[in-house]
């Protein structure tokens, strides 16, 4: 069903329901360590992935998109999925963290890769990733359109501790959200 002009204008002024989930002091292994899974009937738009490592580690970090969910691994304690507006419904996307790496699903592609945690003149700088998707003219967010689609954070080497957050929006999937004008 097409949205009314009022619904379109409200979205422009109020925005979409936005959520944030944190992970802190995660003793992360090498491999797939954090995932955000899509939800049935929802469009999940990943807006920000922030990762901070306070300890000195040479750890390549990758953000990848998968068409199927991960399997196995040892789950850790995921942070609560918090709506940024208390009037928003509970989040439908699912965050998972792993203390033993999960087996990745079917890779669609890599959207970020960098050897970010570096030592400079034998003094650790305390590096971080703050990757924002959908910023700029015409740019899209990292979008999960099915319950099977997953965004994952992959480490090339173990990291202890690993801290950060993922921020995303959720909206019902519709064939064409353009109003009939």
Place the predicted regions along the sequence by residue.
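Extended, solvent-exposed segments with strong compositional bias
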Residues: 88-141
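C-terminal interaction-tip segments
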Residues: 3-45, 52-83, 138-181
